[in-house]
Design a protein with these regions (language model features):
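Solvent-exposed helix-loop boundary motif
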Residues: 17-113, 121-175, 195-196, 206-211, ...
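Bacterial N-terminal signal peptides
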Residues: 2-17
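Aromatic, loop-rich ligand-recognition surfaces of beta-strand-rich domains
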Residues: 428-627, 692-697
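Active-site histidine-acidic residue metal-binding/catalytic motifs
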Residues: 25, 97, 144, 256, ...
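Short, solvent-exposed loop/turn and secondary-structure capping segments
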Residues: 48-51, 55-58, 98-100, 109, ...
Length: 970
C-alpha cells in the first residue's frame, strides 16, 4: 500500500502538472460535440421544428434559452435550479422527460449538468450537421457533398501574419478564424513538434537522440527533412495502414455465435501497409480492393487486396432453413454494401435496404443495383499466387494426382465387387441375437468371468464404420454376476478409469468438460469425447465375477428420439478382461448384435468373401495410394488467403420489399447510384453481366475524377487523423445526417490537390504537416474556447490521448523491447480455444513473441483484447471511422497493475543501468528522456530520487509507464 500511495502521490504531484491545461480541456463539455447531439437525439422529437410542446424548442439557441409557456428551463450557471434538469431526473410519470422510452443515462445527465453549470454556452452560430428545423431530406441538386468540387485559389486575408500567408491551408484556416474574431496560437516548441510528428506519422515516440538532434538543428529545412524522412519510414505505413483497417472493419475472426478465428487474413493487412508505404495512388488502391483479382490477375500482391470485401463479420454457422439462409446471405451482402459505400463514398446506402433512404436521395432500387454488383462475392479462402507458381505447382502435382486417381479408381472397383458379395452373404446368413446399438441403452451379457480389469475397445460408430474416434459415451456400467448384482464401474465404489480424450483440460474454460472420468461419475448428461486409441479401461479395487455391461450416449433420451446434434455413438466393439492388467482375453464382441447400417453389415462379412488374390491386390494398391499421398503431401501447397471467392450469380437480383428476401420485388441489374447522375456518367450493366465486370465497373465509377465524393471523403479522413476531427466530423457519412464541413473551401482545395498529385497521399501529408495550422501550440485559451470549445476552427492544435496500439507500442519502445519486424502472420495476446464456439483467454505472461507492434496483433471480434480494449480498441464488428477516446479510472488501474506494465518496468530498470551507469541522477534523466523526450525539472528530479530511496527503481519506472505525459499528445 505504501508503494502504491508513494507512486500515486509522486505522479499526481508532478507528472499531471505539466499536462493540466490539456487534460482539463479534454474533460471540458463542448456544445457541438456533447450537447447538441444529445438535445437532437433525446429532445427535438417533442421540442423541435415539427413539434414544440409547451411552446418549448430545444433545437434553437434563442428559443431554448428563452424557455416555453411555463418559463425558462435552462438557468445558466445553476443546473440544480434548472427546470430542464428537474424534468429529466424526475420519476413522476406526469413530469419526467422524455415521457416515454429510455431515460437519460448518468453520462448524459452529467454532460447536461456540467454544461449548464459552466454557463450553458451555446455559440450563436456554429457549424453542425442536421438540425431539427432544417429540411427533413437532402436534395441531390443542392446538398453540398453532391456538388462538383470548386477549384478556387484561396485568397490572402489582409491582416494575416506573414508566416500564415504562404500556405493555402493556412490562408483558409485563418480566414475561418478571423470570421469569428479568433487568432491562431503561436507555434509549438521544437520538442513538442517532433514528438507530435513522430506519433502522427509513425505511432511511435522519437528517441532522445532524435529529439536532441532536431532541437539543435536550426537549419530552415530541418523540419521538411524530418517530415520527408518519416514519410519514407516503414513505420508510416503501419500507422496509417492501421487507420485504414479501422475504416475497412478489419477483424481476424468471423464474429457471430461461433466467432472462429481467421488465420490467413493477414495478407490483406500487409497489403494495406505496403500500399501506404509505397504511396500507391488512392484511386488504384480503391479499385484493387474491390476488383484486385480482375486488374491484378496473377499478381498476388494485388489479388490479395480483395480481402477488403471479406474482412468484416461473417455468419458461418449455417442454417437448414432455406428462408433463414436467404436472410443470412442478404445480411452478408449488406455488409459489403455498407463497407464500400461508407469507406469510399461517405454514404449510408445501407439505410435504403428496406425502404427509400429517409434522409438522402437514395431509392431502394439503387441499394439493390449495388447489391447486384456484389452478388457473386462469397466469404472464403482462395489460392493467391503468380501464374508461374501455379504452373510449377501443377507440373509437380498433376502426374501424381493422375496416378493416384487411377489407383483409387481400381481400389473402388475391387471394393465394390467384394462389398456386393459381402452384402448378399450377410442378408442370406446373418443371424443376430442382440438388437442394433442405440444412443439410449445397450446391454451385452456374457458368461461369468473373474476380472480386476475390463477393456472396452470401440471399433466403429454410427457414422464411422472402421473407426471408434469421436464417439460420445456417457454412463458405462459393469455388473456383477449372481442374485445380488451391482454396478462396480463407479468412482464412488473405487473403480478407476482411463482412456483417450479429444479435448485436453486446458482447452476448456473451467476444466476438462469432456474427460473420460464422466463415464463413471454416476450422473447422466455429460459425455466422454472418444479420441485415439478408441478404448476405455476400467480397474476395480478387488477381483469381481462379472457377466454384463451396459453403455449409452444419452440415457435421458426417449427411444427413437432424433438426436444427431449429439454426434456419433458406439456401434461396434470388443470386450476384454484381465486379472493382472497385463494378459487380456476377449469375452464378447458386437458380432452378435445386428449391424447398425448396411456399411457395417458389409464390414463384418468382408473377410469371408475376399479371396487371397483380392486381399493381396488390395494391400498392394492401398500401399501405392499411401505412397502417392505422401508424395503429394510433401509438395508445399499454394498459399491460401481469406480474400473471397467469386462466382457467377445463379439467379437475377431482385428488390426485397421491406428488406425481406421472401418478398421479391422488381428485377434489377448492376448499376451506379442515381444520386450522382448529374455529376458524372453512371454505369448500367446487363443482369447477366459477368461477375468480375460488375465489381470493376463499380470501382471505376467510384474513382472517376468527376465523382465529387471520393476525393473529398479521403482527404477528410487524412485531416481527421492529423487533427483528431475531420473537416466533416462524420468521416463516413457525408449525407444529411452527417456533419457539415467547417471549412468547405479547404475541403475542396485538399480534394483537388489530391487529384493533382496523382491521387498520392504523401504530398498531401507533407502540405498539412508543413502548415502553420498543424504546427500550432495546443495550449488552452479561455477566450477562444468560449467561441469554439472543441477547436473545430483550429485556433490551436487539438491535444489527444494516444490510441490503444500507440500506448502499447510506446511502453515497449521506452523499455527497449519493441520488435519492429514487419508483416506475416500476427501474434496473439490470448490463448485461442476452439470447440463449437471460440474462446479467447487473455495471456498471463508477455514474452518476445508478443513484443511486435500492435498493428500485427491478430485482432478478433467480440473479445476483450488484454491491455488494448480498455483504451478503446474498436471491436470492428462494424467499421470504426472514428475512435472513442475515453479517459477513465479503469485505464489507470489496469495500466498500473497490468502484468505487461510490471514486466516492462523491470526491463526499463535494466535498460537504465546499461545506458546510464550507476549514477542515480543520470539514470533518472535518461528515464525522463526515454519516456517524455525531455529532461526532468529540478523538482521532478528531487521527487524521483525520494521515490527511489523509499520504494526502489521499479517504483519509478512503473510510475513513468503510467504517467499522463506518456499517453497524451500535445
Amino acid at each position: 500500500l505504501a508503494l502504491i500511495l508513494g507512486i500515486a502521490l509522486w505522479m499526481g504531484g508532478l507528472l499531471t502538472s505539466g499536462w493540466r491545461s490539456g487534460a482539463e480541456a479534454q474533460g471540458r463539455v463542448d456544445f457541438e460535440r456533447d450537447i447538441r447531439p444529445l438535445l437532437l437525439a433525446r429532445c427535438s422529437g417533442c421540442h423541435g421544428a415539427e413539434r414544440s410542446k409547451g411552446e418549448l424548442r430545444l433545437d434553437q439557441r434563442e428559443r431554448a434559452l428563452r424557455g416555453g409557456a411555463s418559463g425558462p428551463v435552462i438557468m445558466p450557471g445553476d443546473s440544480a435550479g434548472s427546470e430542464l434538469i428537474r424534468r429529466v431526473t424526475s420519476r413522476e410519470s406526469t413530469e419526467q422527460m422524455p415521457p416515454t422510452g429510455e431515460r437519460l443515462s448518468e453520462r448524459e445527465l452529467g454532460l447536461l449538468r456540467n454544461w449548464i453549470d459552466a454557463g450553458a454556452n451555446w455559440p450563436a452560430e456554429t457549424v453542425s450537421g442536421a438540425t431539427a428545423n432544417e429540411p427533413r431530406r437532402a436534395e441531390k441538386s443542392t446538398w453540398w457533398s453532391l456538388q462538383p468540387m470548386r477549384a478556387a485559389i484561396p485568397p490572402t486575408p489582409a491582416d494575416i501574419p506573414a508566416a500564415w500567408a504562404g500556405s493555402a491551408i493556412d490562408r483558409l484556416v485563418y480566414a475561418g478564424l478571423a470570421a469569428k474574431g479568433l487568432q491562431p496560437s503561436p507555434p509549438a516548441d521544437r520538442r513538442t513538434l517532433i514528438r507530435r510528428l513522430f506519433y502522427d506519422l509513425t505511432g511511435l515516440p522519437p528517441t532522445p537522440e532524435e529529439v536532441s538532434a532536431f532541437v539543435a538543428d536550426r537549419d530552415p529545412g530541418a523540419w521538411e527533412r524530418l517530415v520527408d524522412r518519416l514519410l519514407a519510414s516503414p513505420q508510416y505505413g503501419e500507422q496509417w495502414g492501421r487507420h485504414w483497417l479501422d475504416v475497412a472493419r478489419f477483424g481476424e475472426s468471423k464474429g457471430f455465435e461461433q466467432n472462429h478465428i481467421i488465420n490467413n487474413l493477414w495478407g490483406y493487412r500487409d497489403y494495406v501497409i505496403r500500399s501506404f508505404n509505397e504511396d500507391k495512388p488512392y484511386d488504384r488502391f480503391v479499385v484493387e480492393q474491390l476488383a484486385g483479382d480482375v486488374v491484378g490477375a496473377g499478381e498476388p500482391e494485388v489479388e490479395i487486396a480483395t480481402g477488403f470485401l471479406v474482412c468484416g463479420p461473417y455468419d458461418s454457422v449455417g442454417n437448414q432453413d432455406e428462408a433463414q439462409q436467404k436472410v443470412i446471405r442478404a445480411n452478408t451482402v449488406d455488409d459489403l454494401i455498407t463497407a464500400t459505400s461508407n469507406a469510399f463514398l461517405g454514404l449510408t446506402v445501407n439505410c435504403a435496404r428496406c425502404h427509400h433512404h429517409k434522409f438522402d436521395p437514395i431509392p431502394t432500387e439503387d441499394y439493390y443495383r449495388l447489391r447486384a454488383a456484389f452478388d457473386g462475392v462469397t466469404h472464403a479462402e482462395r489460392v493467391v499466387a503468380t501464374a508461374e507458381a501455379r504452373a510449377t505447382h501443377a507440373a509437380r502435382l498433376g502426374p501424381l494426382e493422375a496416378r493416384r486417381k487411377s489407383v483409387v479408381a481400381e481400389i473402388e472397383t475391387l471394393e465394390k465387387a467384394i462389398s456386393s458379395r459381402a452384402l448378399k452373404l450377410a442378408n442370406r446368413e446373418g443371424r443376430w441375437s442382440l438388437p442394433r446399438a442405440t444412443r439410449q441403452f445397450n446391454e451385452h451379457r456374457f458368461a461369468p468371468v473373474r476380472a480386476t480389469h475390463l477393456r472396452f475397445l470401440i471399433r466403429a460408430t454410427s457414422d464411422r464404420p472402421r473407426s471408434g474416434e469421436n464417439a460420445r459415451l456417457d454412463e458405462f456400467e459393469v455388473w456383477t454376476a449372481g442374485e445380488a448384482t451391482r454396478n462396480i464401474a463407479l468412482a464412488a465404489t473405487g473403480a478407476t478409469v482411463s482412456g483417450s480424450t479429444t479435448r485436453r483440460a486446458e482447452d476448456v474454460v473451467g476444466g476438462n468438460t469432456y474427460g473420460v472420468e464422466l463415464v463413471t461419475d454416476g450422473r447422466f448428461g455429460e459425455r466422454w469425447f472418444v479420441g485415439s486409441p478408441a478404448a476405455l479401461t476400467l480397474r476395480f479395487p478387488r477381483p469381481e465375477i462379472i457377466d454384463r455391461i451396459v453403455f449409452s450416449q444419452d440415457r435421458t433420451l426417449e427411444p427413437g428420439t432424433e438426436a444427431s446434434h449429439l454426434g456419433s455413438f458406439v456401434t461396434e466393439y470388443e470386450i476384454e478382461v484381465s486379472e493382472d492388467g497385463q494378459s487380456w482375453r476377449r469375452v464378447a464382441d458386437s458380432q452378435a448384435r445386428e449391424p447398425f447400417n448396411e456399411a457395417q453389415k458389409i464390414e463384418r462379412f468382408l473377410a469371408r468373401v475376399t479371396t487371397a488374390d483380392e486381399a493381396t491386390r488390395l494391400e498392394t494398391l492401398r500401399a501405392g495410394r499411401r505412397e502417392l499421398e505422401g508424395e503429394i503431401k510433401s509438395i508445399p501447397p499454394l498459399p491460401l488467403h481469406w480474400a473471397g471467392k467469386f462466382v457467377e450469380p445463379k439467379e437475377p437480383t431482385y428488390v426485397h420489399r421491406g428488406g425481406d428476401p421472401q418478398r421479391r420485388g422488381s428485377e434489377v441489374a448492376p448499376a451506379s447510384l442515381a444520386i450522382l447522375d448529374g455529376a458524372l456518367p453512371g454505369f448500367a450493366l446487363s443482369a447477366r453481366a459477368p461477375e468480375a465486370e460488375r465489381r470493376l465497373a463499380l470501382a471505376r465509377w467510384i474513382v472517376d475524377e468527376r465523382n465529387p465524393l471520393t476525393a473529398r471523403v479521403m482527404v477528410n479522413r487524412l485531416w481527421h487523423y492529423h487533427f483528431g476531427t475531420g473537416i466533416v466530423d462524420t468521416p463516413s457519412d457525408f449525407g444529411f445526417l452527417g456533419g457539415r464541413p467547417t471549412h468547405p473551401e479547404l475541403l475542396d482545395w485538399l480534394a483537388n490537390r489530391l487529384r493533382e498529385h496523382g491521387w498520392r497521399l504523401k504530398p498531401l501529408h507533407r502540405e498539412i504537416l508543413l502548415s502553420q495550422t498543424w504546427q500550432q501550440a495546443s495550449d488552452h485559451r479561455e477566450e477562444a474556447a468560449r467561441v469554439d470549445g472543441s477547436s473545430r476552427l483550429l485556433w490551436r492544435f487539438p491535444p489527444r490521448r494516444l490510441d490503444a496500439e500507440e500506448v502499447r507500442d510506446t511502453m515497449l519502445q521506452v523499455a527497449g523491447r519493441l520488435d519492429l519486424r514487419a508483416g506475416g502472420p500476427g501474434f496473439r495476446l490470448y490463448r485461442y480455444l476452439e470447440d463449437n464456439v471460440a474462446t479467447y483467454v487473455p495471456l498471463d505472461h508477455h514474452g518476445p513473441e508478443t513484443w511486435r507492434r500492435a498493428v500485427y496483433h491478430q485482432n478478433t471480434r467480440a473479445s476483450l483484447i488484454d491491455g488494448l480494449t480498455d483504451f478503446d480498441l474498436p471491436d470492428n464488428a462494424s467499421a470504426a471511422p472514428t475512435r472513442a477516446r475515453t479517459i477513465s479510472p479503469l485505464q489507470s488501474l489496469t495500466q498500473f497493475n497490468h502484468q505487461l506494465t510490471l514486466e516492462l518496468a523491470s526491463v526499463l530498470v535494466e535498460r537504465l543501468e546499461r545506458e546510464a551507469g550507476a549514477d542515480d541522477e543520470a539514470r533518472v534523466k535518461r528515464a525522463f528522456q526515454l519516456a517524455f523526450q525531455r529532461p526532468p525539472t529540478a523538482s521532478e528530479l528531487a521527487a524521483a530520487r525520494r521515490l527511489i530511496e523509499e520504494h526502489g527503481w521499479r517504483a519509478l519506472t512503473r510510475a513513468l509507464l503510467n504517467a499522463n505525459e506518456l499517453f497524451f499528445l500535445r
